[in-house]
Amino acid sequence: MPAYRSRTTTHGRNMAGARGLWRATGMKDSDFGKPIIAVVNSFTQFVPGHVHLKDLGQLVAREIEAAGGVAKEFNTIAVDDGIAMGHDGMLYSLPSRELIADSVEYMVNAHCADAMVCISNCDKITPGMLMASLRLNIPTVFVSGGPMEAGKVVLHGKTHALDLVDAMVAAADEKISDEDVQTIERSACPTCGSCSGMFTANSMNCLTEALGLSLPGNGSTLATHADRKRLFVEAGHLIVDLARRYYEQDDIKALPRTIASKQAFENAMALDIAMGGSTNTVLHILAAAHEGEIDFTMADIDALSRRVPCLSKVAPAKSDVHMEDVHRAGGIMSILGELDKGGLLNRNCPTVHAETLGDAIDRWDITRTTSETVRNFYRAAPGGIPTQVAFSQEARWDELDTDRQNGVIRSVEHPFSRDGGLAVLKGNLAVDGCIVKTAGVDESILKFSGPARVFESQDASVKAILANEVKAGDVVVIRYEGPKGGPGMQEMLYPTSYLKSKGLGKACALITDGRFSGGTSGLSIGHASPEAANGGTIGLVREGDMIDIDIPNRTISLRVDEAELAARRADQDAKGWHPAEVRKRNVTTALKAYAAFATSADRGAVRDLNAR
């Protein structure tokens, strides 16, 4: 039977000093011997997805103590990618994932916590905590802050559903008046919560359901809705039960590495492909698998992308559909239910809340459940009142969306497309692969060829796009923006948004060794591996080179013969693999430390001590 980790600091005469310190935090004699549960919060006033989390850690803590555990809360950092976007702040976003994982490890191991509840929400916080949970392999439950309500605005007599990306696109569109831009800006983000579309934050919170590490509804229940409180209350009780199962009954099914097995990662990736999740999820899933020593690679993602159809399209792929609409259609359990009906899911994976994922789907899929409680849960609707307060409204939809032929969630027989929402492309331009969110690509440009417009930075590309120097038919290439070359692998949301604002969203392609925001749509191909700084072919592209993209056949090619490429490579080796133009970029010691050990995106941009 495994011993409680916390007894290292709470038992024995030689731990008198440690017990004295524990007592100073409020512990009593009766607490020594109870499981010590770390409540890993990520409250910050910088991020709308986290601004409402301040009191929720203590809500969970009270439930832990009511269930017989001892709760100890600490905080991690949290970067808002939207606020950090478009300037040097974005260099810090992806590296913050590693810092979050490390900080959780440091706190939990330094104080010998037995288990943890991870209160996450936005882009790098859920992945960082997920990496930590698999690294530590102690009982863990995830409960996120929940998605924001979609914005609503009336412009020129028409009602529009809005999100953050709409504000960015409008601001760059010279045809839209200052007054309308301001109206859109003020309406785009009306409440607390993670941005309202199927962007990175919501994608990752949905994937925790498929991995079996969070409760049903974690990915789709609105931050403002009273129903979300139940997830936090249940998480507090559940984690104590999981801790006791592992430490007192030697039940390894309470551990993250048993729950989030390779089969569970396949489920999560199948969900990601079916719902057209953010391309960033590929990075984070690969990184989490690495931490859990799970053999899950780009090859597995490629194989899944060839057989899993696209069953849901949410903003940015479908601008009038947001997470509140996904929830009304049954949320993640109903998407998993459709995959299950199509034989595309591993039903026997354990979860933190049910014996198997299959059992959970049978109870929580609104098309098969007999529970009115479950059906009422998925009727939770937006309140339509701007607020930063969690659980502040109780609105309900009159009816659920159970239309699997034309609704927000489709059946395998009636998909949005037979090909899934994400695809891995390979070719001489990306030998180790690159990623495209096919759910956001117009069918007319699934095959695309054009001349390269080469930029050594995101900033240079933005300047050219806004100056109308990029034309229809061009392939914009942005390089030296990978994990090492950036450093930090910036998101390219501004270039893609500005292409859209110029009417080029369906007329151009963009290829980068950087990455994209979950808010990106269009023919946007990221994570080109190896990255330019690691000698990738993207570093050899020259202005005007023809590039061929074939999504149906999963290829991406630079139309340059091998002899010419070899000559260019020899020339670049002599010069060194760095941008041809000097970039005004403040690369601090912290960023240099990340760059020194960062791998390319095909490995999840994780650190490798042998990378140097």
UniProtKB/Swiss-Prot annotation:
GO BP terms: isoleucine biosynthetic process; L-valine biosynthetic process
UniProt cross-references to InterPro entries, sorted A to Z: Dihydro-acid_dehy_C, DihydroxyA_deHydtase, DiOHA_6PGluconate_deHydtase_CS, ILV_EDD_C, ILV_EDD_N, IlvD/EDD_N
SUPFAM superfamilies recorded: IlvD/EDD N-terminal domain-like (SSF143975), LeuD/IlvD-like (SSF52016)
Pathway(s) this gene product operates in, as recorded in its UniProt entry: Amino-acid biosynthesis; L-isoleucine biosynthesis; L-isoleucine from 2-oxobutanoate: step 3/4; Amino-acid biosynthesis; L-valine biosynthesis; L-valine from pyruvate: step 3/4
Any GO MF annotation of the entry: dihydroxy-acid dehydratase activity
HAMAP family: IlvD (MF_00012)
Protein name: Dihydroxy-acid dehydratase
Species annotation: Rhizobium leguminosarum bv. trifolii (strain WSM2304)
